[in-house]
């Protein structure tokens, strides 16, 4: 792509050992009906045929560029893409997922008419062999980032992938290296900049459920569950979420459930709440 051409949207796609799904992912992005878009494929040290597929795509379409790097994990790959992004807006797609056709076109058309918007969230579908659950969004603009945080219980849908962000929001924000549930860490940092946030019912991001993935295994893995709890704790602190805040108690319930899981697996207490050890012990005995 000519460097003098204005780029509306940068799509960052981390790639790691996904030769079976990469073509579907990239093809779905190219079918979005957006010309002034760049696709950044970040090969994160793949050991299969993914690097060659990335290079083949870049030769076939000038809007696609490739970064080859040593393995650093999902956050590191996203960060590498952010560093190279030139678009007014940036978004993320995981390489085993895909988009409904025309999703970006409709969202960018809306953004061009609502230039004050900094973060636009759209529907996400969980797709698997036995489930298809849609995370719906209504057409709404929020008075403040905190209003969005509480009104939508954003900690429950902090996914990085079903949102379009003004790229400048990431000027001093990056995804945390070496952590799972990295999205829960990152979204509050962006919201602290008090961006204008909106949600849209248009289109869908199709998240392909993987029974062997982090989300599926988190409740069975004490390390992942601890990191989930720690992410929720930091998110609540960053967004000044009090127990008595509107809907705020729900994030504390999520913390409690993670703590109960951790105690059941390892007997460890992470939350420093009064009587939490007794609550965990009773729950473990009575379940």
Feature roles, as predicted:
Residues 28, 43-52, 70:
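A conserved acidic beta->alpha catalytic loop
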Residues 69-85:
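Glycine-rich, basic loop-to-helix element that forms the pyrophosphate-binding segment
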Residues 94-98:
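The conserved acidic donor/metal-binding loop of glycosyltransferases
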Residues 90:
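Short aromatic/hydrophobic "clamp" motif used to bind/position activated sugar donors
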Residues 1-31:
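N-proximal low-complexity "stem/linker" segments adjacent to membrane-targeting elements
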Residues 103-177:
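Flexible acidic/His/Gly-enriched loops in nucleotide-sugar-dependent glycosyltransferase catalytic domains
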Residues 159, 208-287:
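C-terminal subregions of glycosyltransferases and related glycan-biosynthesis enzymes
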Residues 146-221:
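Conserved nucleotide-sugar donor-binding catalytic segment
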């Amino acid at each position: 792509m000519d460097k003098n051409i204005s780029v509306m949207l940068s799509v960052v796609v981390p790639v790691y050992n996904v030769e079976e799904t990469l073509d579907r992912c990239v093809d779905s992005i190219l079918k979005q009906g957006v010309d002034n878009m760049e696709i950044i494929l970040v090969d994160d040290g793949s050991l299969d045929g993914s690097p060659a597929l990335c290079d083949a795509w870049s030769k076939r379409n000038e809007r696609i560029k490739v970064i080859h790097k040593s393995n650093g994990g999902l956050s590191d790959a996203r960060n590498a893409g952010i560093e190279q992004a030139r678009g007014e807006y940036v978004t993320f797609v995981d390489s085993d997922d895909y988009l409904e056709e025309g999703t970006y076109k409709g969202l960018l058309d809306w953004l061009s008419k609502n230039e004050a918007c900094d973060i636009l969230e759209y529907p996400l579908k969980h797709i698997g062999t036995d489930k298809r659950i849609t995370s719906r969004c209504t057409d709404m603009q929020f008075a403040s980032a905190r209003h969005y945080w509480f009104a939508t219980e954003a900690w429950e849908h902090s996914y990085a992938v079903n949102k379009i962000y003004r790229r400048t929001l990431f000027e001093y924000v990056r995804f945390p290296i070496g952590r799972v549930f990295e999205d829960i860490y990152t979204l509050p940092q962006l919201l602290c900049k008090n961006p204008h946030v909106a949600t849209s019912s248009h289109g869908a991001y199709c998240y392909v459920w993987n029974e062997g993935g982090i989300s599926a295994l988190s409740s069975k893995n004490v390390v992942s569950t601890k990191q989930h709890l720690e992410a929720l704790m930091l998110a609540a602190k960053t967004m000044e979420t009090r127990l008595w805040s509107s809907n705020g108690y729900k994030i504390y319930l999520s913390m409690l459930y993670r703590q109960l899981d951790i105690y059941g697996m390892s007997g460890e207490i992470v939350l420093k709440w009064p009587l939490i050890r007794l609550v965990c012990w009773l729950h473990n005995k009575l379940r």
